[in-house]
């Protein structure tokens, strides 16, 4: 699918370019051409609908709540989620921690909390907020935070 979209973009660019050895049209310097070229380049990358924050959260909660989720899918989902430029909402982390508990994977649960702390970066107020929101789940599932385990100290 991506390859087809790239082929369409390359084909549309070839239509705009002059033949090799031919002089560029004088209209290329006009603002109309630049606007057309800008619109054309935007079209190449703007297909598909945009997902709202609520839809994004629901998609990930549903993913981690699948009853047949295995350890590989859990790690794959977390790696994908970590790749986004955001800190996951507490409800997504809650679903991921519950998946860890279903899989009896304590190490992954602690690693998820470490990743959330890392994703919060220099914003020191985010991680305590997330732990505060997750505290009932952590207590229910018997999951310790990295700080409670002493993993935050070198």
Curated annotation (Swiss-Prot):
GO terms for molecular function: metal ion binding. One of its GO terms (cellular component) is mitochondrial inner membrane. It comes from the Eukaryota. It is found in: Mitochondrion inner membrane. It is a peripheral membrane protein. Pathway: Energy metabolism; oxidative phosphorylation. The keyword Iron applies. Disulfide bonds: none annotated. The modification N6-acetyllysine is found at residues 91, 117. In response to mitochondrial stress, the precursor protein is ubiquitinated by the SIFI complex in the cytoplasm before mitochondrial import, leading to its degradation. Within the SIFI complex, UBR4 initiates ubiquitin chain that are further elongated or branched by KCMF1. Residues 1-45 form a transit peptide. Keywords: Acetylation, Heme, Iron, Membrane, Metal-binding, Mitochondrion, Mitochondrion inner membrane, Phosphoprotein, Transit peptide, Ubl conjugation. A motif (SIFI-degron) lies at residues 2-21. Pfam families: COX5A. One of its GO terms (biological process) is mitochondrial electron transport, cytochrome c to oxygen. The modification Phosphothreonine is found at residue 145. Its main location: mitochondrion. InterPro entries: Cyt_c_oxidase_su5A/6, Cyt_c_oxidase_su5A/6_sf. Belongs to the cytochrome c oxidase subunit 5A family. Component of the cytochrome c oxidase, the last enzyme in the mitochondrial electron transport chain which drives oxidative phosphorylation. The respiratory chain contains 3 multisubunit complexes succinate dehydrogenase (complex II, CII), ubiquinol-cytochrome c oxidoreductase (cytochrome b-c1 complex, complex III, CIII) and cytochrome c oxidase (complex IV, CIV), that cooperate to transfer electrons derived from NADH and succinate to molecular oxygen, creating an electrochemical gradient over the inner membrane that drives transmembrane transport and the ATP synthase. Component of the cytochrome c oxidase (complex IV, CIV), a multisubunit enzyme composed of 14 subunits. The complex is composed of a catalytic core of 3 subunits MT-CO1, MT-CO2 and MT-CO3, encoded in the mitochondrial DNA, and 11 supernumerary subunits COX4I, COX5A, COX5B, COX6A, COX6B, COX6C, COX7A, COX7B, COX7C, COX8 and NDUFA4, which are encoded in the nuclear genome. This is Cytochrome c oxidase subunit 5A, mitochondrial. It comes from Notamacropus parma.
